[in-house]
């Protein structure tokens, strides 16, 4: 597949309009907001046609997204996405990678979220007729493998013909847009501030993609506040998101 075709596929897969199920998850952000742990924000003078003073939490949201990128996606999810991309024709290797994610993800809510989003993505690709999707769905339904998101991204996007670099871009951008979109729906920020955060985060994405990821045996994640928030999410009285 040529570069432009691969890039178009990456844009499609990373689009929030793509029905992959990721929009239902805040990955701990909702609990942090409810508990007042996201930060007080900064009072700034509003622009014309807005209130005189508004609360800007862009820095806090950007910090949350940066933490997820650096200490979870780059060192963990990206590792398994690339390993699955490389092993897309080897079902045994894919199920082993799936099992590693299951074992290394300590928070039950994160395991459930990764499985549910992964299986939602898989279901869409089965409906679209993506090569290899139906066969792997049979493995998931038979209970032979959990179907975690990074493994399915690597498998499915490889089978679509997406280039390795474009797969990583789609995954990183999709994570960022999902988190920032959650912040907007939680009333933490408006759409313009959300776009500023996404723009500000782009240099970090390119910086991380320039680094060699760890091997699956060395994969790790360390986002304690987010993980605790995810575990506490079910105790919230009002919940907009699944975690």
Swiss-Prot record:
GO molecular function, a single term: nickel cation binding
Query: Subcellular localization, per the record?
Result: Cytoplasm
* Keyword Cytoplasm set for record: yes
Annotated keywords: Chaperone, Cytoplasm, Nickel insertion
What does the UniProt record say this protein does? Required for maturation of urease via the functional incorporation of the urease nickel metallocenter.
UniProt-listed PANTHER family: UREASE ACCESSORY PROTEIN F
Instruction: Quote the HAMAP family the UniProt record gives.
Output: UreF (MF_01385)
Q: What is this protein called?
A: Urease accessory protein UreF 1
Species of origin: Pseudomonas syringae pv. tomato (strain ATCC BAA-871 / DC3000)
């Amino acid at each position: 597949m040529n570069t432009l075709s691969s890039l178009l596929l990456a844009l499609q897969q990373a689009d929030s309009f793509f029905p992959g199920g990721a929009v239902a998850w805040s990955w701990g952000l909702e609990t942090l907001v409810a508990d007042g742990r996201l930060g007080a924000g900064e009072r700034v003078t509003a622009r014309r046609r807005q209130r005189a003073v508004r609360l800007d939490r862009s820095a806090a949201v950007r910090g949350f997204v940066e933490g997820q990128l650096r200490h979870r996606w780059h060192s963990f999810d990206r590792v398994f996405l690339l390993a699955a991309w490389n092993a897309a024709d080897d079902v045994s290797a894919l199920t082993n990678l799936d099992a590693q994610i299951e074992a290394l993800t300590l928070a039950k809510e994160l395991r459930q979220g990764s499985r549910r989003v992964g299986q939602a993505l898989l279901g869409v690709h089965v409906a679209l007729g993506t090569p290899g999707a139906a066969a792997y769905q049979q493995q998931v339904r038979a209970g032979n493998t959990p179907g975690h998101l990074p493994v399915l991204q690597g498998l499915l996007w490889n089978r679509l013909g997406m280039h390795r670099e474009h797969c990583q871009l789609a995954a990183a951008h999709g994570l960022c847009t999902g988190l920032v979109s959650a912040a907007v729906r939680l009333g933490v920020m408006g759409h313009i501030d959300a776009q500023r955060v996404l723009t500000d985060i782009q240099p970090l994405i390119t910086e991380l993609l320039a680094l060699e990821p760890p091997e699956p045996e060395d994969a790790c994640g360390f986002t304690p506040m987010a993980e605790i928030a995810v575990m506490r999410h079910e105790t919230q009285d009002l919940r907009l998101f699944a975690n």
